[in-house]
């Protein structure tokens, strides 16, 4: 089976082509860059996606060596995300599936980040079936684990997602978008300043940290030192709540996924924690960390194999988007099952 997945929840646009044994044939991306000093403008991002998607889809199929008639399934990111952006991907996916007369698989974006991480872990030799997952991105900061047939939230941010916090700081101090990689680069050259640390059980709060970091910069601290302090403090908070959730659940597998998982320092801190407590940790590869079409395609295959895809004749009325689609609302009947054939892929 070959699935084409379309990702369009926010500023990133992606098309992935994946087989049902977990082979990623292609994973192409485009990104909307907001105006300097501005955050993501949803309608402008959607216009960018509308312009770029036809060429991106054509390039994906060409690079994968796949003809339209080879496609067995189409998947799209149903939510959560920005409404205008989600609708671009959903409309394209509906049109493609109807044209090809193949099923359409709606995918929860957060679940897809977990599933692509589990796939990559298994392909790298980690037998991860039910890890505690730290999912960190521009729009989400959650500690997730499988319980009672769903991915449940065992910890999360009480205000800003960590990626949004980093991007906001970067924008306020004049760094280009996306801000996370710029902060990571500067932090390597700095000595961490002391900043407030806010953990409540297995939840975190980043608004006070952001305000304090901006104040230190405005008061004359070196940007490199503030970036180092911001990273160390935020990431220590995230590692603490992940460790606490793993201890409460009695789990010894830890998965780090989402766009912020590409940060080397966060990955290093998470792996150090896991080693200290005798657990195994795995960080999703950088090319699969941020939003991408391959994760949608792979999860779409899981959705379809478990009877949750939409038949062609039902697509017009059932292929919708859900801007506030919580991860614990999404059924994941495959998640607790033994590893599939993809486990043996190297």
Swiss-Prot record:
Q: Where in the cell is it found?
A: Cytoplasm
Cofactor names from the entry are: Fe(2+)
**Which Gene Ontology BP terms does the record give?**
tRNA threonylcarbamoyladenosine modification
This enzyme's EC code(s)? 2.3.1.234
Q: Which UniProt keywords apply?
A: Acyltransferase, Cytoplasm, Iron, Metal-binding, Transferase, tRNA processing
- InterPro entries, from UniProt? ATPase_NBD (IPR043129), Gcp-like_dom (IPR000905), KAE1/TsaD (IPR017861), Kae1_archaea_euk (IPR034680)
- Complex and partners: Monomer. Component of the KEOPS complex that consists of Kae1, Bud32, Cgi121 and Pcc1; the whole complex dimerizes.
Indicate the family of this protein: Belongs to the KAE1 / TsaD family.
Name listed for the protein in its UniProt record? tRNA N6-adenosine threonylcarbamoyltransferase
Source species of the chain: Methanopyrus kandleri (strain AV19 / DSM 6324 / JCM 9639 / NBRC 100938)
């Amino acid at each position: 089976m070959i699935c084409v997945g379309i990702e369009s929840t926010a500023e990133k646009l992606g098309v992935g082509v994946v087989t049902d044994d977990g082979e990623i044939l292609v994973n192409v991306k485009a990104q909307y860059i907001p105006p300097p000093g501005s955050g993501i403008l949803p309608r402008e991002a959607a216009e960018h996606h509308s312009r770029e998607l036809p060429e991106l889809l054509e390039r994906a199929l060409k690079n994968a060596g796949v003809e339209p008639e080879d496609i067995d399934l189409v998947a799209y990111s149903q939510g959560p995300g920005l409404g205008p952006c989600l609708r671009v991907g959903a409309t394209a996916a509906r049109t493609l599936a109807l044209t090809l007369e193949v099923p359409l698989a709606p995918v929860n974006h957060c679940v897809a980040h977990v599933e692509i991480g589990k796939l990559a872990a298994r392909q790298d030799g980690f037998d991860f079936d039910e890890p505690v997952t730290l999912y960190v991105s521009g729009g989400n900061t959650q500690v997730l684990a499988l319980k009672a047939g769903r991915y449940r939230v065992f910890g999360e941010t009480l205000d800003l997602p960590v990626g949004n916090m980093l991007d906001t700081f970067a924008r306020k101090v004049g760094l280009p978008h996306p801000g996370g990689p710029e902060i990571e680069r500067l932090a390597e050259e700095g000595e961490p300043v002391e900043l407030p640390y806010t953990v409540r059980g297995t939840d975190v709060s980043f608004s006070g940290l952001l305000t304090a970091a901006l104040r230190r910069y405005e008061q004359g601290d070196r940007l490199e030192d503030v970036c180092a302090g911001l990273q160390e403090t935020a990431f220590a908070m995230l590692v603490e709540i992940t460790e606490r959730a793993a201890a409460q659940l009695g789990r010894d597998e830890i998965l780090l996924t989402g766009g912020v998982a590409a940060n080397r320092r966060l990955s290093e801190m998470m792996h150090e924690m896991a080693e200290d407590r005798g657990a195994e940790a795995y960080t999703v590869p950088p090319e699969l960390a941020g939003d991408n079409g391959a994760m949608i395609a792979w999860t779409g295959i899981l959705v379809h194999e478990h009877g949750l895809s939409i038949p062609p004749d039902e697509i017009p009325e059932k292929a919708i988007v859900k801007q506030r689609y919580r991860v614990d609302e999404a059924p994941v009947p495959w998640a607790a099952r033994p590893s599939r054939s993809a486990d043996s892929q190297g």
